[in-house]
Amino acid sequence: SSDVVLGKTWAENLAIGGKFASDSKLSVSGKATFEEAEVKLSTLWPDYVFASNYNLAPLDSVETFIQKNSHLPNVPSAQEVSEKGINLGNMDAVLLQKIEELTLYNIQMHKQMEAMKAEIATLKEN
């Protein structure tokens, strides 16, 4: 059985240290420590970032977004997180997307730097 017994009653939801959130099977008010936790996602893992048709935003538009909103595009603001919390699995996917985008930006910059080094070498020869 997947039920939890608390005393002499069966509980469908479990709350520890406070009241339970109506949409949760387990609610913990306070710190919880795990040796291991597994999150299973039904959403896309961001491998799509490396697809040839992925629309990587130009860095100047990312900068404009940050200046206007004080957070990265597609990442919740501090206020949103404070008010609504976050889904750990979805947040891991968002953070991985940002890491993969940073990798693509670094590759672009590396290619530009290599091209500039070659151009400088050519100019020095002439």
Can you say where each PLM-predicted feature lies in the sequence?
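Long, heptad-repeat coiled-coil alpha-helices used as oligomerization/scaffolding rods
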Residues: L95, L102, N106-M109, M116
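C-terminal intramolecular chaperone/autoprocessing and neck/assembly modules of extracellular spikes
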Residues: S2-K8, E12-M91, Q112-N126
